[in-house]
């Protein structure tokens, strides 16, 4: 079989282009995610927002219940998980799990991040830090919070937000505890629930939807339209904070004010 020079050159160009694309993909920043569940995939929200810009790698902690006892059972796994992410080549670390990082207060969240940075030498943020950064970025002071949590975890969130400089004017949770249950909440149910919580608030200037397991990306913009205030939610804005940690600002219009601004 004889291959023409033109075909040979075309094949070589195609192989070369493919190799360049593969090399480019491998040189994109790698954001390491520490996730509460044991088997946590790369979040679809991350792929939808930033797949062309960065890569993701995930280590799960094996959290079973969203309760203080559940969080206590995995808290010592966080630094080893961060070290595993460093071994994989992570450029920075994003500690997911809003309640996992706020349940002992703002100072403990800061300590967790300090421990990760000291152990790995990498930049790090957490989901709780991300929602605080998001609320501050939109100028929030009086916050309504719709959550996945039970009353005890809500009480701790209230304390954390107060320590972070916000006044909580309304808060209500879905009462969920099993780690997989937030993902079963439909977006229609969650949007209505969140809007109802906001309506209970007295002059809230922002709405927080708290829990990384809730699927919130597609409801942020509709909620902002309905409530006429900025909406911050756990997973999308943790990914937003992770991008900023990497020194990147990628605009993602259609998903609310913060993501649209990058």
What role is predicted for each listed range?
Residues 1-3, 7:
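N-terminal secretory signal peptides
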Residues 7-24:
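N-terminal export signals
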Residues 23-80, 152-154, 158-186:
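N-terminal glycine-rich anion-binding loop in soluble enzyme alpha/beta folds
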Residues 75-88, 192-203:
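Short, well-structured alpha-helical segments in soluble
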Residues 90-96, 144-145, 204-211:
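Periplasmic-binding protein-like
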Residues 101-120:
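Glycine/small-residue-rich loop that forms an oxyanion/phosphate-binding "nest" at active or ligand-binding sites
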Residues 179, 231-249:
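Short, flexible loop segments at boundaries between secondary-structure elements
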Residues 192-226, 233, 238-239:
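Hydrophobic alpha-helical
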